[in-house]
């Protein structure tokens, strides 16, 4: 009805439905646009983040790690072909692979981030031609780098400060955050981001 009023045409092949729930939904209702049935999916790629029906960000992290891993190996291959110095390769990693790895971390950074740090260390050890058993502290010290989790936590705090800012009190994100906070403090909603 809305589409016909505003004369909008939707591509039904690109429209998907995802039902967010704690467990898998057994009785899936049918969704239609006009007389065309929409597909119900468990995962959906939205703005570069893979959303999962159970609202866990593990699926998004895994997807980002896979993409970053492909970029990392492409960078390693090219840097070996061109015989680039270590400092340049590390700088290229920071500028090309880390943005893929940390994309949307303000949202998923409160979940397990071991896989992200593991990929970062794997790259550094490859570049320095070290064994995988080399202590992580030595690798970070040698390169003068911090674990990517430090950057993730800083970005999360920055996002949270913007979210809580009174300047944003008329924005929907601020209102939703306040509602979630109220539910959290009355023990009606549990959320790792709020705790």
What do these predicted regions represent?
Residues 68, 93, 116-127, 156:
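Short amphipathic alpha-helical coiled-coil/interface segments
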Residues 3, 7-10, 17, 48, ...:
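Mobile genetic element proteins and their domesticated derivatives, centered on retroelements
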Residues 35-108, 170-171:
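Basic, alpha-helical interaction scaffolds
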